[in-house]
């Protein structure tokens, strides 16, 4: 299989040249374009998530030999979460070569966080299957770059941080309420309210409930004394 000029340019951005280019094509093929043949990237995404986790766990252990499991876990989560994968995908301009069905393309799929994050994990798996663990590790460390060393020791997801803040002050856990759902079925938008027992609250909107909850929790955290 011969790759298009756009795909070759993406290979260059990855810093890896495929011996089996069909793996890269599959990694960049979303289910909206291939549901009948199952030649999409879902299985590769599953594998890539595990490869990414192993590489990041190893990198963190080597970067800080004195860190405890409790210190490493939140850093690890910050590096492998979908938002970070999507951020890396955007930097590599993965959206430009993502193969989507017409409806997904029309709804802005090339910019969707979930699709970009999933495709980035699938690309990692494609590199792993094509060139082995060392090749995948090299690509991951190149793309994630300084994030491995810059991720803060107290990095943790916003919902966990907000719950810890509440518990430290004797409050019950924060509650999250779906305020509004809008948009078409293929591209829903959720507005979530995060509220503390003392009445302080914040709202946020995102394309997935979990992301909206995290954004609302972060917004509320940022407003606290």
Swiss-Prot record:
Belongs to the ribonuclease III family. Keywords: Cytoplasm, Endonuclease, Hydrolase, Magnesium, Metal-binding, mRNA processing, Nuclease, RNA-binding, rRNA processing, rRNA-binding, tRNA processing. The gene is rnc. Its main location: cytoplasm. One of its GO terms (molecular function) is double-stranded RNA binding. The keyword Magnesium applies. GO terms for cellular component: cytoplasm. SUPFAM superfamilies: dsRNA-binding domain-like (SSF54768), RNase III domain-like (SSF69065). Its EC number is 3.1.26.3. It is found in: Cytoplasm. InterPro entries: dsRBD_dom, RNase_III, RNase_III_dom, RNase_III_sf. It comes from the Bacteria. GO terms for biological process: mRNA processing; regulation of gene expression; rRNA processing; tRNA processing. Mg(2+) binds at residues 45, 118, 121. SMART domains: DSRM, RIBOc. CDD domains: DSRM_RNAse_III_family, RIBOc. Homodimer. It is an enzyme of class 3 (hydrolase). This is Ribonuclease 3. Residues 7-132 form the RNase III domain. The keyword Iron does not apply. Residues 157-225 form the DRBM domain. Its cofactor is Mg(2+). The active site is at residues 49, 121.
């Amino acid at each position: 299989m011969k790759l298009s000029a756009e795909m070759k340019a993406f290979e260059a951005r990855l810093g890896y040249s495929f011996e089996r280019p069909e793996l890269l094509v599959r990694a960049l093929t979303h289910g909206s374009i291939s549901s009948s043949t199952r030649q999409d990237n879902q299985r590769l995404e599953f594998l890539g998530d595990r490869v990414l986790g192993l590489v990041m766990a190893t990198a963190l252990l080597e970067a800080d030999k004195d860190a405890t499991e409790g210190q490493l876990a939140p850093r690890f989560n910050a590096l492998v979460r979908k938002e970070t994968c999507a951020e890396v995908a955007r930097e590599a301009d993965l959206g430009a070569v993502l193969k989507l069905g017409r409806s997904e393309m029309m709804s802005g799929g090339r910019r969707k966080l979930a699709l970009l994050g999933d495709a980035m994990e699938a690309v990692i798996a494609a590199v792993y299957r094509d060139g082995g663990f060392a090749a995948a590790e090299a690509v991951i460390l190149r793309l994630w770059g300084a994030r491995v060393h810059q991720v803060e020791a107290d990095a943790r997801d916003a919902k966990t941080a907000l719950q810890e803040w509440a518990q430290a002050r004797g409050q019950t856990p924060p509650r999250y309420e779906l305020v509004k759902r809008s948009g078409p079925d293929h591209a829903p938008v959720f507005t979530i309210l995060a509220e503390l027992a003392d009445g302080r609250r914040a709202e946020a909107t995102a394309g997935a409930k979990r992301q909206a909850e995290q954004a609302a929790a972060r917004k509320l955290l940022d407003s606290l004394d």
